[in-house]
Amino acid sequence: MAVLSMKQLLEAGVHFGHQTRRWNPKMKKFIFTERNGIYIIDLQKTVRMVDDAYDFVKEEAANEGVFLFVGTKKQAQDAIAEESVRAGQYFVNHRWLGGTLTNWDTIQKRIKRLKEIKAMDEDGTFERLPKKEVALLKKQQEKLEKFLGGIEDMPRIPDVMFVVDPRKERIAIKEAQKLNIPVVAMVDTNSDPDDIDVIIPSNDDAIRAVRLITAKMADAIIEGRQGEDDVEEATFAAENKSADSMEEIVEAVEGNNDTNTDAK
């Protein structure tokens, strides 16, 4: 059985691509049709490719791989943080700092500083310092926490990176490529799939679509590490059953193509 049904994908709006004037021709093979000026992603292919991504992630997790979830756009921030933590992994959900991977030694120094400030707060040092100095330290802590909190405990450069919106996260992807880190990504109709190792054709703007796919990648990590019985899957309204054909899905899109297309 597929790890996600077409019905689940449909109800989360995974099939909605971008407007036809905003597309990357390399995504043509993943597009089923066009309706009302919007490309419709072929969910039959997405079902298969989610399965492939799930198996890849599960195998890497079984081999004790370290995973970094990356998604800095507003629609992805919560899902990226929550699902990576649920899987016991790491995340970047605000601005990607250049060199996060390729200059890991420098990033580790910033992380060390973050931990030092936290320790000062916890051991009572702040109580003995002037208020002005404490305010500056807290401001520094807040900034470091925002950008590095999700990788504070990451033991090494990740073995796999999961990305929402490769166009927005192109710097992160370039760093991963330079270090031969495989990238699993949700790829919308305006992105270049050639940059991605494991492609999931998907709407990467709708919150529900992002949550659905991201949660499933977290499930794969948990299953790979602990076994299928320990996977606590996220709950979605969609029933886990085989979906309708792509033709029926396209019919459903008629008159409803403004749903789940945030920021398209």
Swiss-Prot record:
GO annotation terms (biological process): translation
Cellular component GO terms held in the UniProt record: cytosolic small ribosomal subunit
Its Gene Ontology molecular function terms? structural constituent of ribosome
Q: Which InterPro entries match?
A: Ribosomal_uS2, Ribosomal_uS2_bac/mit/plastid, Ribosomal_uS2_CS, Ribosomal_uS2_flav_dom_sf
Matches recorded under Pfam families: Ribosomal_S2
At the top level, the lineage of the source is: Bacteria
Cite the entry's keywords alphabetically.
Ribonucleoprotein, Ribosomal protein
Q: Sorted alphabetically, which NCBIfam families does this protein's record hold?
A: rpsB_bact (TIGR01011)
State the family named in the UniProt similarity comment for this chain. Belongs to the universal ribosomal protein uS2 family.
Q: Which PANTHER family does this entry report, sorted A to Z?
A: 30S RIBOSOMAL PROTEIN S2 PROKARYOTIC AND ORGANELLAR, SMALL RIBOSOMAL SUBUNIT PROTEIN US2M
Q: What's the name of the protein?
A: Small ribosomal subunit protein uS2
